[in-house]
Amino acid sequence: MMKYFISLSLIALIGLNSCSEPTYPSEYSNQVVVQGYLMANQPIDSIIVRRTARLEEYVSEANLAINGAIVIITSNEINGIVDTLKAMPGNPGFYTSTRNPQNIIKPKQTYTLFVRTPDGRTVTATTTVPDTFHIIAKETFPRVIYYRKGPVVDQTKPYIIDWTSSSMHSDYITSVTSLDSLADQIPRDFGNNNEEKPNRTSYGFNYIDKTHTEIPWFTFHYYGKHMLAILAIDNNYYNFIRQANSGGTDIREIKYDVIGGLGVFGSAAMDSLIVTLQPN
């Protein structure tokens, strides 16, 4: 799940200097960009290390990747983990844990990311993982739902998902992942249906500050089987997406919870359920 976790953040970062006010090639600042997320009760996923892009250059994973970096994740507990990540073959700029057995991320634990690039630049960041929670009455939630229709007992009302509270400070977002690669795309209300197909995973950036929400229909792009997830996100990721989504000239005022570079090193706890979406 984490490899899909809101990857648009890196898109915003690598193109940072192309936003807002006019920018000239001479103003380019080569900075290290990191992106990584830890998921409670899951093994360490990949950390991405790249550089910022010049305004005039072709942007790709390969030419922005920083290879040969030292990437380490540590925990602050006594006898905690020290995991040196290794480069992922065929994925420039991606680093992953090769430990066996795997290190499992603990809820309510604090972790630090350390990155040193081949040219000696150092980037660090720290995240405290939200506590776990669970969706209430998951077993009785309908396994088949109809697009933009409510429960059978009253189809004019929305489906509501309730969950227990993450005991630490957390805001929540929703994610919807299509699990059926052959499922039909939901016709768009606006635009051209011949446009590029949407991603299989989409997110509702509604910063839910309570423990219930309506089913977010706008995040469904396909019919068929889906994983509907609730994520409790840490302060780092909340701060980043709250600022990045503001748009306009505010993009230059983003404050990163990263020392020595740009990016986001965040964490989350998640619970999910599986539903099949049928046409209305």
What are these regions (language model features)?
Residues M1-N17:
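Sec-dependent bacterial lipoprotein signal peptides
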Residues C19-N280:
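A sequence/structural signal for flexible, mid-protein segments enriched
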